[in-house]
Structure formats: structure tokens, C-alpha cells
């Protein structure tokens, strides 16, 4: 005979919930996330723990480069950050290390017209990078295996864990008998649960489907509904960011924040950054656009 369990055994402790809300009230309200290092981007997106973010953009837009710069900014602001990276397109791995060192040292690694980092600067920069970044083995191919491996590093309560899978499209997806839409929905639900349970922040880099050029030859900004696989990307993700730039005209970079689930962490809108190609860093441009740009989430 099935045991009847009183409903009161399953609800949240209401007194504890009330007291937690009161504590937040007296502290000023729900907190923002951690700064990206760019005040203009912080207007629209801050990094909350226990969440996940989609980063997308057309090929060559710099989405991986921007994400690297974001992680360096986070670790410089708070040394507790540890990032687990799966980034097979950043090959060889030593090249990815060098790019992160350049961002840390603010000098180029290679010989050239710009003042190059010294061997001691490389040594200190590399030591810093290796304190905050580790690379997952590329023989782990499925999103489930990679997330499990990354989350095995969450044991130290004094560290903040960030996980990057870049890009999603290169992973091996074992769908079994499921269609792609159902598979994407299932895996992304798992990403949400893992982030919530562990307090990690997960970034998934996702290539959009092929996007046709405008009549003037420019390429439109990809939207969440252009992502390869499923509209579940928009429904499931906590945050969606598109990195976009004109690859011919210059180094102005558009950071399109197209979804933010929790209003204390940000809002939709557009911030502009300037890209320094020599060391791979991004700098503020005092030009921000309010969120009406994305008033209709169904726009294409």
C-alpha cells in the first residue's frame, strides 16, 4: 500500500525563507553578480554563481577571445576563481596559454614592433594563469562527461568554479533515439541543475546556423533563435550574449546581451568595446544602448 506523505513534509522551511529575505532586505536587496571588468557591460550583464551563459557570434567575431578576456578580468578581481576549459579549437593548448598570459601581462609574446614581454614577465604571467586555469582532456567528448570532470574540482569551498565548453558544436552528442530538439532540451536542463547545485558558472560557446549577408554585404547580429540545434537555447539559458564586430571596418566590438533571466544581474541591451589585437584585451567605449533593441524576443 502506498504511504501517504503529508504535504508539509515537502515544503520549504517558511520561517527560514522569511528570515533570508529579511536579511537581503537589510543588506540593500538582491545582489548584482560579479563585475565583468567593463562598467558598460556590467550595465547589462554581471556574472552570477549557479548560472550558465550562452556566448555566440558569427565565425571570426571574437567570441572565444572575449570570453578569455572576461575570465582574466574575473580572476584579477577575485583570486578565488578557477576556470576549467574545454577548448579544442584553441590548438595547441600552449597557444591558448600564451594568449591568456598576454592578457595578464598586457604585452605581446611574439617579437614585433611592440615592446615584448620579458622572460620573467612570461614566467610570472604563466604562473598566474596556471593558478586560475586548467584544461580538460580532449578525449572527453560528451557534454555530460566534460561537465562531470569540471565539477570534480569544486571541492575547495574557498574557490569559485567557472566552466567553459567551447564550442558546443564540436562535442559528441549521444542522442540515442531522441530527435535533436528533445536531446538539446534534456542536456540543457542538466546544465541548469548542475550549475544550481554546485554554484559554478558555466559558459557554453555556440555557433549560430549559417546566416545570410545583408544586401549591403554586412552580416546581421545572430539572435538566440539562430543557434544551431533548437529554440531551447533561448528558453533554457540564464543569459545569452552575442559578440559581434565588422571584420573589415575596424576593432569596435558589440556586446549584445540578448537575455538575462534575473533582473538583479542585468538586463538586455548593447555595450561597445574596443579590441586591442596586440594583446587580446578589450577596452571601454562610452556608448551603451538601452534594452528596447530586444523588446521582441521573437525578432530574427
Regions found by a protein language model. Give the residues of each.
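Helical hairpin unit composed of two closely spaced alpha helices linked by a short loop
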Residues: 161-194
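C-terminal regions of RecA-like/P-loop NTPase motor modules
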Residues: 1-20, 112, 124-126, 143-160, ...
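Structural recognition of the conserved hydrophobic beta-strand(s) that form the central parallel beta-sheet
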Residues: 85, 164-165, 200-207
Amino acid at each position: 500500500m502506498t504511504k501517504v506523505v503529508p504535504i508539509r513534509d515537502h515544503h520549504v522551511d517558511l520561517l527560514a525563507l522569511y528570515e533570508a529575505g529579511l536579511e537581503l532586505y537589510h543588506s540593500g536587496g538582491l545582489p548584482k553578480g560579479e563585475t565583468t571588468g567593463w562598467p558598460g557591460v556590467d550595465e547589462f550583464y554581471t556574472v552570477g554563481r549557479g548560472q550558465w551563459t550562452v556566448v555566440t557570434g558569427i565565425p571570426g567575431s571574437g567570441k572565444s577571445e572575449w570570453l578569455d578576456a572576461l575570465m582574466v578580468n574575473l580572476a584579477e578581481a577575485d583570486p578565488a576563481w578557477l576556470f576549467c576549459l574545454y577548448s579544442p579549437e584553441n590548438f595547441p593548448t600552449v597557444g591558448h596559454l600564451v594568449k591568456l598570459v598576454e592578457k595578464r601581462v598586457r604585452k605581446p609574446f611574439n617579437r614585433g614592433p611592440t615592446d615584448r614581454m620579458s622572460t620573467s614577465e612570461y614566467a610570472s604571467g604563466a604562473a598566474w594563469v596556471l593558478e586560475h586555469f586548467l584544461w580538460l582532456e580532449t578525449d572527453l567528448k560528451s557534454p555530460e562527461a566534460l561537465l562531470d570532470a569540471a565539477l570534480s574540482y569544486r571541492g575547495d569551498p574557498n574557490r569559485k568554479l567557472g566552466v567553459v565548453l567551447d564550442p558546443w558544436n564540436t562535442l559528441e552528442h549521444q542522442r540515442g533515439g531522441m530527435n535533436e530538439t528533445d536531446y538539446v532540451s534534456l542536456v540543457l536542463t542538466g546544465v541548469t541543475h548542475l550549475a544550481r547545485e554546485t554554484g559554478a558558472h558555466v559558459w557554453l560557446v555556440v555557433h549560430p546556423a549559417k546566416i545570410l549577408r545583408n544586401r549591403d554585404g554586412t552580416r546581421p547580429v545572430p539572435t538566440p533563435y539562430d543557434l544551431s540545434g533548437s529554440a531551447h537555447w533561448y528558453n533554457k539559458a540564464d543569459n545569452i550574449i552575442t559578440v559581434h564586430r565588422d571584420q573589415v571596418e575596424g576593432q569596435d566590438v558589440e556586446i549584445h546581451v540578448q537575455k538575462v533571466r534575473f533582473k538583479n544581474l542585468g538586463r538586455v541591451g548593447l555595450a561597445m568595446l574596443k579590441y586591442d589585437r596586440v594583446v587580446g584585451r578589450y577596452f571601454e567605449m562610452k556608448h551603451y544602448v538601452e534594452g528596447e533593441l530586444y523588446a521582441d524576443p521573437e525578432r530574427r
